[in-house]
Amino acid sequence: MLYRKISNLIENHLASRTNSILLIYGARQIGKTFIIREVGKKLFKNFIEINMIEDANGPGLFKNVTTVDDFLLHLSMVAGGELGDHDDTLVFIDEIQEYPELITLLKFLRTKGKYTYIASGSLLGVHLNGVSSIPMGSIMKVQMFPLDFEEFLIANNVGIEAIEEQKKLFEKELSPTPEEHSFFIDLFRKYLLTGGLPDAINEYLRSRNIHKIRAIQNETREFYAMDAAKYDKENKLKVERLYNTIPSFMENKKKRLIVRKIEEKKGKTFSDYASELLYVVNSGIALEVDAISNPFYPLAESETKSLLKLYMNDPGILSSIFYGDNIKAILNDEKSINLGAIYETAVACQLRANGYDLFYYDNKSKGEVDFLIDDTKSLSVIPIEVKSGRDFMVHSSLNTFTTNEDYGVKKAYVLSNSGTVLKKGIITYIPIYWTMFIQKQSFSDEELIIP
């Protein structure tokens, strides 16, 4: 079984017997159902799983449910003999987006207190926007992502102790040994091939067959397109076109979204694709990175420009599009191959999984920096530059950015293939696989006490 960090959150939430109901949402094929099932069966004597897509395609028992009594009646019809009470029965409502009004009903199911509930959905990020009454305070929404690099390491039997040792080096700004660097950079490149889809990683662990891995990734992309056609019928072609053009945007030097390229139509603006952009981001199949030209902490309060980048939600999917079954392009570090788009996608996915909202710096006169994130410890912005080549110490835009006193930057990172950690002023050069350690600041209990 693949280790998922979110399992700790799910287990703690359910074990706490809190009144709020946990909703796990995210893209398809990332392991939501599996991990909830594993944790639920571990903690509860009775585990009831109801897939609402299967119900909609079958008996439709829950299609017109509008009250708690109706829900409990139909629940007893499918799982009567397995139902206990609140403390020993977990009811898992899977693919809840199929019946959006059930999201509203969760509040009243919680109040009734007959059983414990948890829910998940592939398109909750989309459908929550259309729910008539979201039960605020009654639900806890958590977005799930494909496996990040740290989870990939654990899947490859890399010990927690070894990962923690790397984290200590990161915190002390010390270089790994050449042997350690060779080991981790090799696994990072393999992660660029497999990505974080559970089925793709399991196939890699089972067979190492790139053709089979690519088949899984390609099938997942097709699933995403099918979902778009099903849940946004009016604009499905525009959604598919937008999603399918993301790789081509990644191949451009600036990598930003060019509106006229989506449908090859002049005169189009972002407003013409507002709903489509909302879909690909809220469904979890793409990551949005907004442009900021005058950044200040917190970034959410900085004025954004009408520019953005879209990244695929998984580096393996992007590498399958760019390189197919050719693994040499990534594993052999070919000089003629620019892996910038793949590297940036991996970094975007890791930072997003670490809980960061993503921005990038774009200023006509001062250049561009790949990523900007908030640092809650120093109350400042951290700029991050991603370098896939050997000229990783060349970054004029980052230099300009970090020396601008108005921005108040206290720390910056350059991520590259190099295993040598360097510190030049406020810029720290670290191996790209250490992105997993760029995490939101956590505080001790003592520091949280208000005097």
Summary of predicted features, one role per range:
Residues A56-H86:
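Short glycine-rich substrate-engagement loop in P-loop NTPases that contacts/grips substrate
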Residues K32:
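Conserved lysine of the Walker
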Residues L83-E101:
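Conserved P-loop NTPase "ATPase switch" module shared by AAA+ and STAND
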Residues T116-S122, Q143:
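Structural recognition of the conserved hydrophobic beta-strand(s) that form the central parallel beta-sheet
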Residues N157-K328, D333-C349, F359, K364:
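Interdomain hinge/linker elements that couple catalytic modules in large macromolecular machines
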Residues G125-K141, L153-V158:
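Short regulatory helix/loop adjacent to the ATP-binding pocket of P-loop NTPases
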Residues L14-L23, A27-Q29, E38-K45, V281-P451:
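A cross-kingdom feature that marks ATP-driven nucleic-acid transaction machinery
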Residues M1-A15:
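N-terminal pre-Walker A segment at the start of P-loop NTPase domains
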